[in-house]
């Protein structure tokens, strides 16, 4: 019976019957709504209409049905926030009485009503939140027990298309969540899946279809006999099969409408809405209007162009709802109210409509002249206060600023002029681009409560409606419908999270292309975007995002204008007048795909913006040349937008050298003055007057100081002037103020003394400016040298990009008709490019023809090359190792993977907050304080002088008799004031930090640690989390042979002959595994020469084959003694004559292709090595499978000790790698790391670092590869291995020269010592100022303590010397040696078990369970046989421990056996 009929008749029933009927209907509907997967489940957390009509809102069955209590095991909880999220989510479900989650026990106790909710549904709800949930042992779910064999069946499916462990995880994760699936085991090596299922809930065909929908090829291999169900089972099946029960949204809408009319609190409003075009409009209206206060329910029908809204009239009015819908972007919705609704009805909410906020633009500005934090804040304050500016961020370290602004309100030129008016030099660093944030309706953000908030914040989610024709070159217009009924294709962009490798990309593309209405799919791995062209009459963009979500990824439709458009600048020759300009501009703007064209006759340049999907740079050049002009690409310096600091380095170097040349004699004279004379009456030679009032010393001081003041100090004056222009006082202002007043005062009193013909030359302060300028200029010079290093990392990254590409024109059967060398800037999407062996892939693309191996270490960090075949994705900047290939360009310019990595590094360097020197932060308060004290001293002594002249006369040094009393008072007060200003000069404060940093970095370099400046040295002691890369960091990064096994029952050759044959065969291979095997064989044989190989063939992804001869001579020259291995098989004699061996070396597939059978014991032995993180390959000689080689990347011997030491220091340690989870777990167990992030991209590493930083932690990243460089730049301290890539070294803050991981510990230890010394220096400087300033001000004159001017200079010099001597004490630092670390770890350092290591995939924080021996695993491996037939004859220099050592230090470079070749 239709529940709506029951509900519609409520009003005609007696009160008691009506109440019972409503309860019955509510129980039925809400029990169906509680099923997982219903789109309206989350919106029904309360009873809504039932409460409002006076009925009981809860389920009546809750009180009558008995409640059950069960325990659910939950994996993946990390904090109490997880606990609260689970409790809030589950407690809101219907049928849940209560839930208590325990973080310590990793479980939840749930009390629920079985008739409404079962345990499996609860587990699924928890898993949907990102956790792993399962019923505790001994607890039965509310459906038939899984443990009953009679209710389970097993099916084996053949699954093709899996390439890595990520594919296995995706299949297992998706299928395991299906109702009726008990367990699943997917084998990558066997390309099959074994699934135990409940046949009354799901069938094998359904399982096969689900796997096919994920983008794989699946077929049923075999299945168990179908179950025969009795009458009881049939009844149970009917009651359990929840899939047959559905509730349509229309039923729910009608249901609420009926209830709404019955109650006095809710009303139902039918509306007519015009302007809706697609499902995105429906989601836009429902998602925003449904969250307004007073709106209980809303249902929008795209087909009928109507909406049914259930609302509270006391909170909201129909006119308010009409205004709210019409205010939603894009603003073209037209709402008609039903007849009878008063249009002038008062509104309870604001109906003022605000215009949609325009798209923001971001500009990056280069700002010269920023010297400290006090310069940064005024710029940010000034910009943020300007109308139209939404956000600003200034980087002191880079000298750049990012501004997000609305171009409709303020222009970029106005912003640049405003900053220049503050005294800085500004230039535009990069082109502006449009930003339109996508509104995420699933987020927990608060909903706007006013119409202005809605209009300003809600963003349109409709797909791009532009036509997307096939690229046909210039001048071709997009296809338009020829009839009114025709519809052009549309394009949408989907943001995808969770992709970890090229296999994920292939799966998404393959799966989407299976669905009707999808015309083409293009997925970018690094940027996490998918470009989909589709038929809007068949499918809509939200449905496309849902299809991707069904594959196990997070997906959301992006805004149309988030897609970057092409931008090119051309040099055009041949223009003579404005008519030429008009012809070019009009021709370009008429061309389909060109959105903007501007030609300047004076500069002969053209600026063109275009849609790269329709037209390309070469097409634009061709258009211009066709109308009679010549066009070429304007040369752009790729590093022009980076601040290289060359100008600043040059000017501060000049300032320092000038100050030093004239400052050294001044310092020498100061030392001379401090030397006491032999007799008190004797006058020093330099004190003799040349003329009355002018001594030799003062004349020399004047000459030297004048040069320093106006040459060496010129740039200080410039910086101080700019600082004062924007009303801030920094260290430059204080330095200039002190030196200028000291110089001016000294000059004035010297001139006065000469004019008065004084008998004695006065004491001057000419020695102050040279000393200050020398030290400060040196610090500024070194500072800018360090800053210049930041741009070198980006330059190194850009050097990885190819400069030219070979674009080919293809004929029939892919026959190359023409080849052309094209600059990278002119490569277009869709171009076919040829790449020869050893060349770089110039762009991201797909292989059209050819097979090869590609070195993609710049992305994955792994040295193992990856097989590329037709259809495979290649990455710009990677190396083509073997054969020539043709590829189709899919991402060019700024969309390539390499460009994305460059962008990541740029953003990391821009966003990193530099740690300012304590003196700089202090100077903002210190400068005005000292000026006030100095002024106050002047005023006070003038007053004291006029009140009691005797005080001044007593302490003023030998005033001339010709000077009046007033002049004496003024001179004395001014001298005291100058003494305060000079003695308080920030020389000691300024030297406190840089001297300690200079000594600390020098000591670090002597100990094998290169620290780039003071910021990382200061920051290192605050580090709370260290993230290690794997390959090349924790491990050596080079594969090594760990074990060599011979089969005793088939081997007929002695071990050394097998080694000679295998080594000779592999000598012709370029694969890293082949190089490792050859090196091992040479070491074991003790020779550098091998035999000869012919007919060599290497098959990418499989192995090699060849014929080997002339190995007897090698064995004869070898010092090794032959040891036959075969049981009962005599060794081959050395004098038997030359032999030729047919050799096969490779993986399982290679052996199968060559007709060799792999027995189960050999396969199990290979699997055992692979589970330990090693790569196992097989050896066949003369058609007989005779051996197996295990190869791995060994862990560095000090890695485990370094990890233990860091942990003992209270530092958290994590492993983050692009390698697979199996390998990552194997490494983590060996070195003692509990938390692992595997299969991550460079962007994932940056995001993980940012995530930890957002939690308030200081993070250090240790890596060695190009893929690590963005994370190294983002981390608070980036630490690079000295043997790593140049890019990583340039991006890092610290470089470990000796490639020793214990130096990570040493750098933190030295940082603590250095910071401690800096603090001591600052304390000494502050004590000096706190004591010296009162003395200089004359506070202690009444008790006889007087500071003469020369004493002030001497005290200032003494304070500087004391700070320098304090810093030099760091020279005594000694790095803790290895023996000390080993003694501390003795007996405490133990490897972890697999269950102690939590592995997370990509950016997914859900923990992947460690492998445990479950009952299912035991059943799966019950057929394993003994490996007694395998014996190890590896002759190792490590003696008997070789086998154990191989297991202990083994590591798999890649577990994708099918992609490894020798």
Curated annotation (Swiss-Prot):
Enzyme type, top EC level: translocase
Polar residues bias locations: 475-487
Binding site for Cu(+) 4: 372
Residues holding Cu(+) 1: 79, 82
Residues bound to Cu(+) 5: 501, 504
Molecular function GO labels: ATP binding; ATP hydrolysis activity; copper ion binding; P-type divalent copper transporter activity; P-type monovalent copper transporter activity
Membrane topology: Multi-pass membrane protein
GO BP term (any one): response to copper ion
GO cellular component labels: basolateral plasma membrane; late endosome; membrane; perinuclear region of cytoplasm; trans-Golgi network; trans-Golgi network membrane
Reaction it catalyzes: Cu(+)(in) + ATP + H2O = Cu(+)(out) + ADP + phosphate + H(+)
Residue segments, region Disordered: 1-23, 333-361, 460-487
Residue intervals passing through the bilayer: 656-677, 700-719, 727-747, 767-787, 922-944, 975-996, 1320-1337, 1349-1368
Assigned EC number: 7.2.2.8
Keyword Transport listed: yes
Enzyme active site: 1029
InterPro entries, per the entry: ATPase_P-typ_cyto_dom_N, ATPase_P-typ_P_site, ATPase_P-typ_TM_dom_sf, ATPase_P-typ_transduc_dom_A_sf, HAD-like_sf, HAD_sf, Heavy-metal-associated_CS, HMA_Cu_ion-bd
Ranges where the HMA domain occurs: 68-134, 153-219, 267-333, 361-427, 490-556, 566-632
The protein's role, per its UniProt record: Copper ion transmembrane transporter involved in the export of copper out of the cells, such as the efflux of hepatic copper into the bile.
Domains: entry comment: Each HMA domain can bind a copper ion, they are tightly packed and closely interact with each other. Wild-type ATP7B can usually be loaded with an average 5.5 copper atoms per molecule.
Family, as annotated: Belongs to the cation transport ATPase (P-type) (TC 3.A.3) family. Type IB subfamily.
Quaternary structure note: Monomer. Interacts with COMMD1/MURR1. Interacts with DCTN4, in a copper-dependent manner. Interacts with ATOX1. Interacts (via C-terminus) with ZBTB16/PLZF.
Disease: Defects in Atp7b are the cause of the toxic milk mouse mutant (tx) phenotype, characterized by accumulation of copper in the liver in a manner similar to that observed in patients with Wilson disease.
Protein name per the record: Copper-transporting ATPase 2
């Amino acid at each position: 019976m239709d529940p709506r009929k029951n509900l519609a008749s409520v009003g005609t029933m007696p009160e008691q019957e009506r109440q019972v009927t409503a309860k019955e209907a509510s129980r039925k509907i809400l029990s169906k709504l509680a099923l997982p997967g219903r789109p309206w489940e989350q919106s029904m957390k309360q009873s809504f209409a039932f409460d409002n009509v006076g009925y009981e809102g809860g389920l009546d069955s809750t009180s009558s049905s008995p409640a059950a209590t069960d325990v659910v095991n939950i994996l993946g909880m990390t904090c109490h926030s997880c606990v609260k999220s689970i409790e809030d989510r589950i407690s809101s479900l219907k049928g849940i009485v209560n839930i208590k989650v325990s973080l310590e026990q990793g479980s939840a106790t749930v009390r629920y009503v079985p008739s409404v909710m079962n345990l499996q549904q609860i587990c699924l709800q928890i898993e949907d939140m990102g956790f792993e949930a399962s019923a505790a042992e001994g607890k039965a779910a509310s459906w038939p027990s899984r443990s009953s064999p009679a209710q389970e069946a097993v099916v084996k499916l053949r699954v093709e298309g899996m390439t890595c462990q990520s594919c296995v995880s995706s299949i297992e994760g998706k299928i395991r969540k299906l109702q009726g699936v008990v367990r699943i085991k997917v084998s990558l090596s066997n390309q099959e899946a074994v699934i135990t299922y409940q046949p009354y809930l799901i069938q094998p065909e359904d399982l096969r279809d689900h796997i096919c929908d994920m983008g794989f090829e699946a077929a049923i291999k075999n299945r168990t006999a179908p179950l025969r169900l009795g009458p009881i089972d049939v009844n149970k099946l009917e009651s359990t099969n929840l899939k047959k029960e559905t509730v349509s949204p229309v039923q729910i809408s009608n249901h609420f409408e009926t209830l709404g009319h019955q109650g006095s609190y809710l009303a139902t409003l039918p509306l007519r809405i015009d302007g809706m075009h697609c499902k995105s409009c429906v989601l836009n209206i429902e998602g925003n209007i449904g969250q307004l206060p007073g709106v209980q329910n809303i249902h929008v029908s795209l087909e009928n162009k109507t909406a049914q809204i259930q609302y509270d009239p006391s909170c909201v009015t129909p006119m308010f709802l009409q205004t709210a819908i019409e205010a939603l972007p894009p603003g073209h919705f037209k709402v008609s109210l039903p007849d009878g609704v008063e249009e002038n009805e008062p509104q309870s909410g604001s109906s003022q409509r605000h215009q949609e906020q325009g798209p923001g633009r971001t500009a990056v500005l280069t700002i010269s002249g920023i010297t400290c934090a006090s310069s940064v804040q005024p710029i940010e304050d000034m910009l943020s206060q300007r109308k139209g500016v939404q956000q600003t961020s200034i980087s002191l370290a880079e000298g750049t600023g990012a501004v997000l602004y609305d171009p409709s309100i303020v222009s970029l030129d106005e912003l640049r002029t405003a900053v220049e008016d503050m005294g800085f030099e500004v230039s535009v660093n990069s082109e502006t681009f449009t930003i339109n944030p996508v509104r995420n309706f699933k987020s927990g953000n608060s909903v706007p409560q006013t119409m202005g908030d809605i209009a300003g914040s809600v963003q349109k989610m409709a797909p791009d409606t532009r036509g997307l024709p096939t690229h046909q070159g210039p001048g071709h217009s997009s296809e338009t419908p020829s009839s009114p009924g025709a519809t052009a294709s549309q394009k949408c962009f989907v943001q995808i999270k969770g992709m970890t490798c090229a296999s994920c990309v292939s799966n998404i593309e393959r799966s989407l292309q299976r669905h009707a209405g999808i015309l083409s799919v293009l997925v970018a791995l690094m940027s996490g975007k998918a470009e989909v062209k589709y038929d809007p009459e068949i499918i809509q963009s939200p449905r496309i995002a849902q299809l991707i979500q069904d594959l196990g990824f997070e997906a959301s439709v992006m805004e149309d204008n988030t897609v970057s458009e092409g931008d090119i600048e051309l040099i055009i020759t041949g223009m003579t007048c404005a008519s030429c300009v008009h012809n070019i501009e009009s021709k370009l703007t008429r061309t389909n795909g060109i959105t903007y064209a501007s030609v300047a006759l004076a500069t002969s340049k053209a600026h063109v913006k275009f849609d790269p999907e329709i037209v390309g740079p070469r097409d634009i050049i061709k258009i211009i040349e066709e109308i009679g002009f010549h066009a070429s690409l304007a040369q752009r310096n790729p590093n022009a937008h980076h601040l290289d600091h060359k100008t600043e380095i040059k000017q501060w170097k000049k300032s320092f050298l000038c100050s030093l040349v004239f400052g050294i004699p001044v310092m020498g004279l100061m030392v001379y003055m401090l030397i006491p004379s032999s007799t008190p009456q004797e006058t020093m030679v330099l004190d003799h007057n040349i003329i009355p009032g002018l001594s030799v010393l003062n004349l020399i001081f004047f000459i030297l100081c004048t040069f320093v003041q106006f040459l060496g100090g010129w740039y200080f004056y410039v910086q101080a002037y700019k600082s004062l222009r924007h009303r801030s006082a920094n260290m430059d202002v204080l330095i200039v103020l002190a030196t200028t007043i000291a110089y001016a005062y000294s000059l004035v009193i010297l001139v006065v003394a000469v004019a008065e013909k004084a008998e004695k030359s006065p004491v001057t302060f000419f020695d102050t400016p040279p000393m200050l300028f020398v030290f400060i200029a040196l610090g500024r010079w070194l500072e800018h040298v360090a800053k210049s290093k930041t741009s070198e990392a980006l330059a190194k990254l850009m050097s990885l990009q190819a400069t030219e590409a070979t674009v080919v024109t293809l004929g029939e059967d892919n026959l190359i008709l023409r080849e052309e060398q094209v600059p990278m800037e002119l490569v277009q999407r869709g171009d076919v490019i040829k790449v020869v062996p050893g060349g770089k892939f110039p762009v991201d693309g797909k292989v059209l023809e050819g097979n090869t191996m590609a070195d993609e270490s710049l992305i994955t960090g792994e040295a193992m090359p990856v097989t590329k075949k037709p259809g495979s994705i290649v990455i710009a900047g990677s190396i083509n190792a073997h054969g020539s290939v043709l590829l189709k360009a899919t991402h060019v310019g700024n969309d390539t993977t390499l460009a994305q990595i460059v962008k990541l590094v740029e953003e990391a360097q821009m966003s990193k907050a530099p740690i300012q020197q304590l003196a700089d932060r202090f100077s903002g308060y210190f400068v005005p304080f000292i000026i006030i004290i100095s002024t106050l001293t002047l005023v006070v002594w003038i007053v004291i002088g006029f009140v009691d002249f005797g005080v001044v006369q007593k302490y003023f040094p030998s005033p001339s008799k010709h000077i009046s009393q007033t002049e004496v008072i003024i001179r004395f007060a001014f001298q005291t004031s100058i003494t305060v200003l000079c003695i308080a000069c920030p020389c000691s404060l300024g030297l406190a930090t840089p001297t300690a940093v200079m000594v600390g970095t020098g000591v670090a370099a002597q100990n094998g640690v290169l620290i780039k400046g003071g910021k990382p040295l200061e920051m290192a002691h605050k580090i709370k989390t260290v993230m290690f890369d794997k390959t090349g960091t924790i491990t050596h990064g080079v594969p090594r042979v760990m074990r060599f096994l011979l089969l005793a029952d088939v081997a007929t050759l002695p071990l050394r002959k097998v080694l000679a044959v295998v080594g000779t065969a592999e000598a012709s291979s370029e694969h890293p595994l082949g190089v490792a095997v050859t090196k091992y064989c040479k070491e074991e044989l003790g020779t550098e020469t091998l035999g000869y190989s012919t007919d060599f063939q290497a098959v990418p992804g499989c192995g090699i084959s060849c014929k080997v001869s002339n190995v007897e001579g090698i064995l004869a020259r070898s010092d090794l003694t032959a040891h036959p291995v075969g049981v009962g098989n005599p060794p081959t004699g050395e004098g038997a004559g030359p032999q030729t061996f047919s050799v096969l070396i490779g993986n399982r597939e290679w052996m199968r292709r060559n007709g060799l059978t792999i027995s189960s014991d050999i396969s199990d032995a290979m699997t055992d090595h692979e589970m330990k993180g090693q790569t196992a390959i097989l050896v066949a000689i003369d058609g007989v499978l005779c051996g197996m080689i295990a190869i791995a990347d060994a862990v560095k011997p000090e890695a485990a000790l370094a990890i233990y030491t860091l942990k003992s220091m209270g530092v958290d340690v994590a492993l983050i790698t692009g390698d697979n989870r199996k390998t990552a777990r194997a490494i983590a167990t060996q070195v003692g790391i509990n938390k692992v992030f595997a299969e991550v991209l460079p962007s994932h590493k940056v995001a993980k670092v940012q995530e930890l930083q957002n939690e308030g932690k200081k993070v250090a990243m240790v890596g060695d590869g190009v893929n690590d460089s963005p994370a190294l730049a983002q981390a608070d301290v980036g630490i690079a291995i000295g043997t790593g890539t140049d890019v990583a070294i340039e991006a890092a803050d610290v470089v470990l020269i000796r490639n020793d991981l214990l130096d990570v510990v040493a750098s933190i230890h030295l940082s603590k010592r250095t910071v401690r010394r800096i603090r001591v220096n600052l304390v000494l400087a502050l004590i000096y100022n706190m004591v010296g300033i009162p003395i200089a001000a004359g506070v202690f004159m009444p008790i006889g303590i007087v500071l003469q001017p020369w004493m002030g200079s001497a005290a200032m010099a003494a304070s500087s010397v004391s700070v320098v001597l304090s810093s030099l004490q760091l020279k005594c630092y000694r790095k803790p040696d290895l023996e000390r670390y080993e003694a501390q770890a003795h007996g405490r350092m133990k490897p972890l078990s697999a269950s102690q290591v939590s592995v997370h995939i990509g950016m997914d924080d859900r923990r992947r369970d460690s492998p445990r021996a479950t009952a299912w695993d035991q059943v799966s491996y019950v057929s394993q046989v003994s490996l007694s037939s395998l014996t190890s004859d590896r002759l190792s220099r490590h003696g008997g421990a070789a086998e154990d050592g191989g297991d202990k230090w083994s590591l798999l470079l890649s577990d994708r056996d099918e992609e490894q070749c020798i």
